[in-house]
Amino acid sequence: MAQVMISQHPLVQHKLTLLRRATTEPKKFRELVRELSQFLLYEATLDLPLQERIVDTPLAPYHGHRIAERVGLVPILRAGLGMVDPILDLIPTAHVWHLGLYRDHATLKPVTYYNKLPPEVDVDLCLVLDPMLATGGSAVAAVTVLKEWGASRIKFLGLIAAPEGVQALHQEHPDVPIHLAAIDDCLNDHGYIVPGLGDAGDRLFGTG
């Protein structure tokens, strides 16, 4: 799939291995999510358009550039929250809107319980953030909500995916690029990615 990009950066693969360890404590887990999110953001924004900007250095004017597009971050609650701050560190002007989607454990289907999108679209690029792309239901639902809202350019950023989730998102929204650190083997009977890393939300926030 041309729209699925898996980072092969050695640091990404090194840190992803540390993230997966069952013995990694929540504090270290959050730090690793932060670092991996920034690596993925770097790769996902390589095509951001630029416009010329002139600034004064201590010696002379300099003809430089600035990002031409307005960026919006859409973390899927709650695990997506762990990816917001590291991205804001690099794009401090980004807008942040929250979508609350939980997976019904009986049907494995997403249920929307929170939506804080403004009345009108005021960004050029939306980045949907969720560390885990498992069944793909939440990601598909989030992108659908954004398109119905009027967003025209959307990308998905996640750390680990199952083939089923990638297929579901790509099939429903083939125009949405998917940026990942890894695609794992499969989903188990409970809808968890295998080998995965467990429940990302629980590990981020020390619950479960």
Swiss-Prot record:
Keyword Lipid biosynthesis found: no
Q: Where does 5-phospho-alpha-D-ribose 1-diphosphate bind?
A: R78, R103, D130, P131, M132, L133, A134, T135, G136, G137, S138, D199
Which Gene3D superfamilies does the annotation name? Answer: 3.40.50.2020
What reaction does this enzyme carry out catalytically?
Answer: UMP + diphosphate = 5-phospho-alpha-D-ribose 1-diphosphate + uracil
Family annotation (Pfam families): UPRTase
Disulfide bond sites = none
Binding locations of uracil = I193, G198, D199, A200
The record's cofactor note says: Binds 1 Mg(2+) ion per subunit. The magnesium is bound as Mg-PRPP.
Q: Which cofactor does it need?
A: Mg(2+)
- Broad EC category: transferase
A GO molecular function annotation here is: uracil phosphoribosyltransferase activity
Which keywords, in A-to-Z order, does the entry hold? Answer: Allosteric enzyme, Glycosyltransferase, GTP-binding, Magnesium, Nucleotide-binding, Transferase
Q: How is its activity regulated?
A: Allosterically activated by GTP.
Write out the GO biological process terms: UMP salvage; uracil salvage
Annotated EC:
2.4.2.9
Provide the function of this protein: Catalyzes the conversion of uracil and 5-phospho-alpha-D-ribose 1-diphosphate (PRPP) to UMP and diphosphate.
Q: Which family does it belong to?
A: Belongs to the UPRTase family.
Q: What is this protein called?
A: Uracil phosphoribosyltransferase
Q: Organism source for this protein?
A: Roseiflexus sp. (strain RS-1)
Question: What lineage does the source organism belong to?
Answer: Bacteria, Bacillati, Chloroflexota, Chloroflexia, Chloroflexales
Its gene name is upp
